[in-house]
Each structure stands twice: as structure tokens, then as C-alpha cells.
Design a protein with these regions (language model features):
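Conserved, well-ordered alpha-helix/loop/beta-strand core segments that scaffold catalytic motifs
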Residues: 1-68
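C-terminal regions of proteins
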Residues: 42-45, 52-105
Length: 105
């Protein structure tokens, strides 16, 4: 299912300001994109790009591109967000690799 509303940029700014405050207190905050069904990801690409760009502009980017977590539709159950067991294993492996790549292990 594609996103149907434009991202609420003011809400993203509120979120990124909170992240910055946490970081100022020495708290490590890591943003990983959610899992997407590939069809939904492709239909929502402009929205996802807008969110990603806003996060980057606020210096609170995702650790990896959201496309990394766009999985074939067959790895999802009844929604574009509910991964199957195989999809969960794949995402877990990617999360571990992504955290390792930034020195979190």
C-alpha cells in the first residue's frame, strides 16, 4: 500500500530535534529504515525520498538507504509491513551487518 499523505515535515523536525538533544546528552541514536514490501516502496518512493532528505538535512540520517530494507513482496504476510519468518531472518541479518558497519556490535 503506498503512502497517501505527504510527510509532515514539521513533525520530522520535532523528531530530529529530540534526537539531537539525546545526542547532546551522550546518548547514541541510530536510525534504520523500516521494512518495505518492494511494490509499496516503489509506489511510495517520492514520499520516502522526502522523509530521507529531511532527516539528512537535519543531520539525523538513516544509517543506510531505505531501499536496503525493501524486500520482495513474497516475504510479507497480509500487509506491506508484516514480514514472514524468512523475511524477519533476512532483516535481522541486515540489521546486524549495518550495526557492525558503524562499529556497534
Amino acid at each position: 500500500m503506498p503512502l497517501t499523505e505527504r510527510p509532515k515535515v514539521d513533525q520530522i523536525h520535532i523528531f530530529t530535534n529530540e534526537v539531537k538533544q539525546l545526542r547532546e546528552r551522550g546518548i547514541k541514536v541510530i536510525l534504520l529504515p523500516p521494512s518495505y514490501a518492494l511494490t509499496s516502496f516503489n509506489m511510495s518512493k517520492s514520499y520516502i525520498d522526502e522523509i530521507t532528505s529531511t532527516l539528512e538535512g537535519d543531520s539525523v540520517p538513516f544509517v543506510v538507504s531505505p531501499s536496503r530494507y525493501a524486500f520482495t513482496d513474497t516475504l510479507f504476510w497480509n500487509t506491506a509491513y508484516h514480514l514472514s519468518a524468512e523475511g524477519r531472518r533476512l532483516r535481522t541479518d541486515l540489521v546486524i551487518a549495518d550495526l557492525d558497519s558503524i562499529g556497534i556490535n
